[in-house]
C-alpha cells in the first residue's frame, strides 16, 4: 500500500471552493480508480481553517494512475487559489498492517 497524509491551511473565504474541488477529486477516484482505496478529507475541530487529506492506494502504480486524471492535473491551480500553505506532507510508503490486507 502507498499513501500520504497532507495538512492544508485554507485561505480565508476559500474553504467551500477547496472542498468542492476535493469532493470532485474523491468522486473521480471512486468512479475511475480501482487502486485508490482511500481519499478522505478531514477537519480537526480545534483547527479552524485546516483540512487534512488522507490518501491510500493499492501501490505506487495506483497513485501514478490517480495522477493521470483531471483533478490531479488541476491541483496546482486550485492550490494557488485556495490554499495558504500545504504542510506536513507525510509519505506513507510501506503499510505494515491493514484491514485491507489479503
Name these PLM-found stretches:
Residues 2-9, 38-67:
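Short, well-ordered beta-strand segments in beta-rich or mixed alpha/beta enzyme
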Residues 13, 24, 46-48, 70:
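Short alpha-helical
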Residues 40-49, 76-102:
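Glycine-rich beta-strand-turn "strand-cap" elements at beta-sheet edges
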Amino acid at each position: 500500500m502507498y499513501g500520504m497524509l497532507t495538512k492544508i491551511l485554507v485561505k480565508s473565504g476559500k474553504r467551500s471552493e477547496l472542498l468542492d474541488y476535493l469532493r470532485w477529486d474523491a468522486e473521480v477516484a471512486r468512479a475511475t480508480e480501482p487502486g485508490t482505496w482511500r481519499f478522505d478529507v478531514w477537519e480537526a475541530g480545534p483547527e479552524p481553517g485546516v483540512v487534512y487529506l488522507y490518501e491510500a492506494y493499492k501501490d505506487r502504480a495506483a497513485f501514478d494512475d490517480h495522477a493521470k486524471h483531471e483533478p490531479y492535473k488541476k491541483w496546482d491551480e486550485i492550490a494557488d487559489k485556495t490554499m495558504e500553505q500545504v504542510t506536513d506532507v507525510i509519505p506513507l510508503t510501506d503499510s505494515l498492517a491493514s484491514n485491507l490486507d489479503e
